[in-house]
Amino acid sequence: MTRIVIIGGGPGGYEAALVGAQLGAEVTVVDCDGLGGASVLTDCVPSKTLIATAEVMTTFDSSYEELGIIVADDTPHIEQAARVVGVDLGKVNRRVKRLALAQSHDITASVTRAGARVMRGRGRLDGLQAADGSRKVVVTAADGTEETLTADAVLIATGGHPREIPDALPDGERILNWTQVYDLDELPEELIVVGSGVTGAEFAGAYQALGSRVTLVSSRDRVLPGEDPDAAAVLEDVFRRRGMNVMARSRAQAAKRVDDRVEVTLSDGRVITGSHCLMAVGAIPNSAGMGLEEAGVRLKESGHIWTDKVSRTSAPGVYAAGDVTGIFALASVAAMQGRIAMYHFLGDAVAPLNLKTVSSNVFTDPEIATVGYTQADVDAGAIDARVVKLPLLRNPRAKMQGIRDGFVKILCRPGTGIVVGGCVVAPRASELIHPISIAVDNNLTVEQIANAFTVYPSLSGSIAEVARQLHTRKRAGEA
């Protein structure tokens, strides 16, 4: 029986374990924290659970008056009025941890039910490949005891951890990274969020919705520099309109506690203060101390593991998946990398990883979902595409729900009308992007999308309307 050892129990690891076991291999998963990895225990699942509460708060705050809702105490609408609803952050965070642990237990049950073995500990490669093609993996348990496993193939799926600034080290109380925020029992009165990427933007929006006064420190010209510029502009406008202090072109250099306050020093000498500070300045791959280079595994300068499109590393019999590869920090991509690795090694049919069909979402309010080629690709000349953007303000369902911010954007080939990308900014954009994802994955045309029935009224009607406009322009261009 083929022996496979998987180091790391996140989406890349546990999905690979399920596939490997189903294909008849003897699979061992080595994990030190609990299956699900950071995605389930400290990152994706916890943050989206927190955001679920924030979403309810935002929806109510922004639309209850327009929709004719009167609160029980008949609170009048005055400038700087007290909020009519509040949040118990301790209760929210207890729910966050409870759901994360439940999800981890469910994953463990699925993996063991499939026939895989789960070992608690840290794994490292022991030297080069043996003459028979096998490899040794040393597992160190929490008590220091070691066990050596023999594997025909090894998958590295160890994820990453929060990057730290030397002069702004988290203390777990006032200066926090994103794994520590769920230990808070009280809502931060004034939260400084350092970093305006996906993690920073999500937490800044969530805590503002929960009731904190938020300052977002961005070293770039705008929030979410890696996202569609139109989408980022909408979100930044929403943030500012709701009272967030967004500081663009401001790089944090240091953060320190002063009694019960935090002082953040910017690179230009300015100092801002708050009750708490959240550092969201990227992640570092968990690739150190694993004997990777000694085993022939090539690392990039960033510490990420180099892989090809079927998850192979430079070392025979060693594969890698997930955040440790630095390819695309998404649970869905990690899971696909892990599955591809197993299919490839075990001789099953496999399609190489295609990042142009990956859909992603920023869980702010509104959400920002994208798939395929982007506006930046078009602007840079990477692809010739027609682009139509339709504001949600014109959508009847959006009007009924009091939705003012957002749009649907679709990109298609000029000649054929084949859909090559899209961006949706809306509540639940993560759900609305799916039909565009299907179109990108299956080379569907804007005509096919336009001809499909949509419910009236619905936000998805805007997707069909954008497709109709693109199809009309295509026909006009052919005339």
Regions found by a protein language model. Give the residues of each.
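Flexible, glycine-rich terminal cap/loop adjacent to redox cofactors
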Residues: 5-12, 16-33, 38, 45, ...
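Short hydrophobic core segments
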Residues: 5-7, 123, 148-159, 193-194, ...
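Beta1/beta-strand and adjacent pyrophosphate-binding region of the FAD-binding site
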Residues: 1-12, 187-197
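Glycine-rich flavin
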Residues: 2, 18-25, 30-187, 215, ...
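General small-molecule cofactor/ligand-binding pocket signal
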Residues: 117-119, 176, 245-247, 386-388
